[in-house]
UniProtKB/Swiss-Prot annotation:
Endpoints of the signal sequence: none
Residue ranges with Basic and acidic residues bias: 193-205
Lineage per the UniProt record: Eukaryota, Metazoa, Chordata, Craniata, Vertebrata
Main localization of the protein described in the UniProt heading: cytoplasm
Compartments reported by the entry: Cytoplasmic vesicle, Secretory vesicle, Acrosome
GO CC annotations, alphabetized: acrosomal vesicle
Gene that encodes it: SPATA1
Keyword field: Coiled coil, Cytoplasmic vesicle
UniProt organism field: Homo sapiens
Coiled coil: 287-374, 400-453
Transmembrane segments: none
Protein name: Spermatogenesis-associated protein 1
Record has Zinc-finger as a keyword: no
């Protein structure tokens, strides 16, 4: 009984893996209360923000569903990664992916060390809002899917593959490093392809020298044979020795040719080698990189052209600004001279008009006096010449003359008022026009000053 108890003990470190084994081996499934149902989602292409290395939870509705899982809550992400293809099917799962964890309002990438620590219960309530598991299939610049954990697993497998008994090398570490470096610098591909035949030739030369040294040792060993054998079989040994030397030389020449041919084959068939499944993608990646370089060169040329055009336009703008400033100063000087000329004329005419106005007022006063005297004389004459019949007073000539003089006086006064009103109106119109022109000039000056200040701030 003690032995059975010891056998049934489960180690603490491998508890999640043991639970998976028990689930797969035991026909009786555990109760549903011990399992957790998780909905698995994929992040679609183009939605992941590679600059910020995160994505908002508001875009979760656009994620692609891959199915759901019923697993133990104590299972770690590392163990789930190994068995995820069995739960959901290999077709529904990407070859290489990353787990995502909801923290706050964003999704964060789970690193390799955290995969062995995080358990699936942290992705279900009450630890999470929704029982959902998010996967991110990551694409490199050559179009291959990769993730930090799977790259490390590949390196471990390649290290183990080198030491296999069959002697077949699946994928050495240098190849993975070569692929990583080739994405950064495409010129490495040409250099490595050129160096491969040289290395193979050196190896072939080394093998040939080793075979020659072995032949020399055999010859020395054969020369140390007993004298009886040398005497008895001298002729036969000489012929055999010469034949062996010729055969060895032929073998070394053939081996050299074969090594060179194998090196050339490796040089030619390097992209189609079965141990490098990503080699066909390298050509497409190189073409993409070359296209990117050509596009970059085009963009750089366009940038240079735009800079030259900008400089040319800036020079033209500066010249135009200078010409505008000169024209503005010239127009300002013209206006100033015109203003001064009109001001002088106005003062001179004002001096003249003052004396003329005095003369005019005197003449008006004299005219009024003459008009009053004339009316008094006509009225006195009318009284003297008044007939006895009052009905004929309106028909007299004197009365008509009085009316004519009164009407003429009224007409003269109206003319004077009209002339004064005309003068006032003309002055007001001129003043208004002058005010409008001054306002326009002030506006243009203000706009120019604003432009100059803006340009000064920009510089």
């Amino acid at each position: 009984m003690k032995k059975d108890k010891k056998r049934n003990k489960i180690p603490i470190d491998n508890y999640p893996i043991q639970t998976l084994v028990n689930m797969s081996l035991n026909p009786s499934r555990p109760s549903s209360s011990e399992l957790v149902e998780l909905h698995v989602f994929y992040v679609p292409e183009g939605s992941w923000n590679y600059k910020l290395n995160t994505i908002s939870t508001e875009v979760v509705n656009k994620f692609i569903s891959a199915g759901f899982l019923r697993v133990s809550p104590q299972l770690t992400l590392r163990a789930l990664r190994e068995r995820l293809g069995e739960f959901l099917g290999e077709d529904a799962i990407a070859e290489k992916f990353l787990f995502l964890k909801c923290i706050g309002n964003n999704l964060a990438v789970v690193k390799e060390k955290q995969e062995s620590e995080l358990k699936l219960k942290s992705f279900a309530p009450p630890y999470a809002l929704q029982p959902e598991l998010y996967l991110l299939p990551v694409m490199d610049h050559l179009g291959n899917v990769y993730s930090p954990s799977t790259v490390i697993l590949d390196e471990r497998q390649t290290n183990n593959g080198v030491n296999e008994a069959d002697g077949t090398i699946h994928r050495p570490i240098s190849v993975t490093l070569f692929k990583e470096e080739l994405g950064r610098d495409p010129s490495l591909l040409e250099n490595t392809l050129k160096e491969l035949p040289n290395k193979n030739q050196e190896e072939a030369g080394g093998k040939a020298t080793a075979e020659k040294s072995q032949i020399a040792k055999n010859q020395i060993g054969n020369s140390e044979l007993p004298g009886s054998l040398e005497d008895s079989n001298n002729d036969c040994f000489g012929t055999k020795k010469s034949q062996c030397l010729w055969e060895n030389e032929d073998d070394t020449a053939i081996s050299r040719r074969q090594d060179n041919q194998t090196a050339e084959k490796e040089y030619i068939t390097l992209p189609d080698h079965p141990s490098l499944p990503c080699q066909p993608v390298l050509s497409s990646g190189i073409t993409d990189i070359s296209l990117l370089q050509t596009e970059r060169e085009k963009i750089i040329k366009q940038m240079k052209q735009v800079k030259e055009e900008r400089r040319y336009l800036e020079r033209n703008r500066e010249e135009l600004v200078k010409t505008v400033e000169k024209l503005f100063e010239q127009s300002k000087l013209k206006r100033y001279h015109a203003y001064n000329g009109w001001k002088k004329k106005y003062l001179e005419t004002k001096k003249v008009t003052a004396s003329m106005e005095e003369v005019l007022t005197k003449l008006r006063e004299d005219l009024e006096l003459y008009y009053k005297k004339l009316l008094m004389q006509l009225e006195a004459r009318e009284i003297k010449m008044r007939p006895k019949n009052l009905a004929n007073i309106t028909d007299s000539k004197n009365y008509l003359i009085i009316q004519i003089t009164e009407v003429q006086h009224a007409i003269d006064q109206l003319k004077r008022k009209l002339d004064t009103d005309k003068m006032k109106l003309i002055v007001e119109v001129k003043m208004r026009k002058q005010a409008v022109s001054d306002l326009r000039t002030l506006k243009t000056e203000l706009a120019q000053k604003k432009k100059i200040i803006h340009l000064y701030n920009l510089n």
